[in-house]
Amino acid sequence: MFDLTGRKALVTGATGGLGEEIARMLHKQGAVVGLHGTRVEKLEALAAELGDRVKIFPANLSDRAEVKALGEKAEAELGGVDILVNNAGITKDGLFVRMSDEDWDSVLEVNLTAVFRLTRELTHPMMRRRHGRIINITSVVGVTGNPGQTNYCASKAGMIGFSKSLAQEIATRNVTVNCVAPGFIESAMTGKLNEKQKEAILGAIPMKRMGAGSDIAAAVLYLASDEAGYVTGQTIHVNGGMAMI
Amino acid sequence: MSDIAERVKKIVIDHLGVDADKVVEGASFIDDLGADSLDTVELVMAFEEEFGVEIPDDAADSILTVGDAVKFIEKAQA
């Protein structure tokens, strides 16, 4: 089950905690993995650690030309991208009444527009091959909302609508488009929270613990696999029961 | 048949997986060759790539048959 031998995957934001876990999981299951990120040294370190079947693709996702070039390069160097994981994302939190145009624009640009552009580059070859898996990492807050994150939540909700629409357009080509929506996951981001903040978060999670990156990676693996061929336009929520949607 | 017509025919055969004898000038992509709307978009993209021409959306909408495609490309390259 869930064997990805011979498949080629591109994971964006592979230097972040979640992206790294996803890349490791797909690699472990046999896929050739393209690692995208902005920090070349971190990409090289992860590539060295994984060993064979890895290529790195540094690119700045807020630069539209670089996003296009990333798609072209990954398609050419990996020999066709079968699995695209749009994982890269940024936050620029702040209360709405004080949110600047820049903070709004930069979050939408990286989290949503880059997804549109990169996916556009890679969808057509997938359609031609009559096989593809597009997996977008959204967030529970894209569905529930979260104060202080109007920009981030808009981008993540946008991703879900984008995925559902694209899923309908290309379903006949055996290209599936799905989302994985993590809840609170232990990461560098949540590591910065103080005890009180942590307690408040855990209080809202029936499982009383944060998730691990591997919990998310497992959901991604499922959607990437041949076994999930009949699943499209869906969002899998992995959140310890925090929101039941 | 002109060179352009031959190349168009080959793209249509490859893409839609239809018999060569069905791909005649008057054959409609959708009605005669079983294409769906995505196929027609993909065909247009394949023509653009093969012939190095740009086919705007409104022109693409008027390319309904094999002959339409050949005529458009001949004109674009003239």
Curated annotation (Swiss-Prot), chain B:
Keywords: Cytoplasm, Fatty acid biosynthesis, Fatty acid metabolism, Lipid biosynthesis, Lipid metabolism, Phosphopantetheine, Phosphoprotein. It comes from Agrobacterium fabrum (strain C58 / ATCC 33970) (Agrobacterium tumefaciens (strain C58)). Pfam families: PP-binding. Belongs to the acyl carrier protein (ACP) family. The modification O-(pantetheine 4'-phosphoryl)serine is found at residue 37. Carrier of the growing fatty acid chain in fatty acid biosynthesis. One of its GO terms (molecular function) is acyl carrier activity. Its main location: cytoplasm. HAMAP family: Acyl_carrier (MF_01217). GO terms for biological process: lipid A biosynthetic process. This is Acyl carrier protein AcpP. It is found in: Cytoplasm. One of its GO terms (cellular component) is cytosol. The gene is acpP. NCBIfam families: acyl_carrier (TIGR00517), PRK00982.1-2 (NF002148), PRK00982.1-3 (NF002149), PRK00982.1-4 (NF002150), PRK00982.1-5 (NF002151). 4'-phosphopantetheine is transferred from CoA to a specific serine of apo-ACP by AcpS. This modification is essential for activity because fatty acids are bound in thioester linkage to the sulfhydryl of the prosthetic group. It comes from the Bacteria.
